[in-house]
Amino acid sequence: PVYEREYSEPEYFKRFQKFNINDINEPEDLVEVAKFLTANHNIASKRFVYEQYDSMVGTANMSTNFPTDAGIVNLKDSNKALAMTVDCNARMVNANPEEGCAMAVAEAARNIVCSGGSPSAITNCLNFGNPYNPEVYWQFVGSIKGMAKSCRKFNTPVTGGNVSFYNQSSVDGVEIPVFPTPTIGMLGIVENKDDITTLAFEHPDSSIYLLGESLNDINCSEYLVSYHKFNESTTPFFDLDIEFDLQTSVSSLIKNKLILSAHDISDGGLFITLLESSMYNNLGFSIK
């Protein structure tokens, strides 16, 4: 059955859209900002957690000594491999559920593609507050619309998933719902293991290319929220058609052996992306 419940747009939605980057002062000490972001708990390595268990999955994990945006699982006696990733930024979904969830699917696809694979299908874990709260149900409806939009674009059917409602806390007798968190798990296929692509810079004399248009956009960023303590902004610029075309181009570059590594820009922005790519082989970077 299809539920037809009441839903309404929260008051904050239009308020968040009024954010202006010019209202944020640019810090004088950018080195201090870089150190702050690098140590941020949402950005820093989670190795201390996942190394507590069998993170190598026996001998099947091909990402152990070859870091990739998506986890690569070896298919023995085959030239193919599986690429897997889990993605969601609840802050962006809260700011704009439809765009935020569409972006979560797109980021999952981006991780698969940057690793040398092709997106195949998704599952999900949808975490929301009380569905009888019209504003919470509005978040849920928007998230489903965004997920559907991206899945159609990337041709990734939803093979399964679950919905968890009533995730909330009671503060002074008031129900506070969690941020809407439609977590996306995506499976991809690497048709040829030779196409597996690391996120790490490989050679000190390599050139670094930024693909896609770079915009002066800090909306919903970890930098804006954690460093400036500013929590009211909408989602950053996102165009699903441009995203799809860009991922198609990256896939072509990988298959034609035109690039040595690929890494998507995510939490922490361009600086963190460059830092993550440079650390594994102890290589620095110089950019203009």
Residue ranges and their predicted role:
Residues 1-288:
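Glycine/proline-enriched, intrinsically flexible loops and inter-domain linkers
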